[in-house]
């Protein structure tokens, strides 16, 4: 039985700034490739929760892997749900159901309420 195709949409991510190398006469500027990560967002949340606490680069790397993993799981599950219901669009409803299926008990409840709050804030700002 063929497995449903997994969608991997590229989320908008912010991270380290591009660094330019020193320029010689006649040379064109070469920019270093951007490494996308969730590090600035993880850092912002850390400062909201614990303003006096820092984070090591190794811990940040672990957090980045964690966020990427959870994103892929939720996106995959939401894609499957849309496919089962013969829909071609992943809506907030599929995301919410995917979160309920993937996260355990109280964690799912909190995630759903925070997600609902974020969607409400977004739609009211439009």
From Swiss-Prot:
Residues 13-34 have a biased composition (Basic residues). GO terms for cellular component: nucleosome; nucleus. Gene3D superfamilies: Histone, subunit A (1.10.20.10). SUPFAM superfamilies: Histone-fold. Its main location: nucleus. It comes from the Eukaryota. SMART domains: H2B. There is a cross-link at residue 121 (Glycyl lysine isopeptide (Lys-Gly) (interchain with G-Cter in ubiquitin)). Signal peptide: none annotated. Glycans are attached at residue 113. One of its GO terms (molecular function) is DNA binding. The modification Phosphoserine is found at residue 15. The nucleosome is a histone octamer containing two molecules each of H2A, H2B, H3 and H4 assembled in one H3-H4 heterotetramer and two H2A-H2B heterodimers. The octamer wraps approximately 147 bp of DNA. Belongs to the histone H2B family. This is Histone H2B 7. It comes from Gallus gallus.
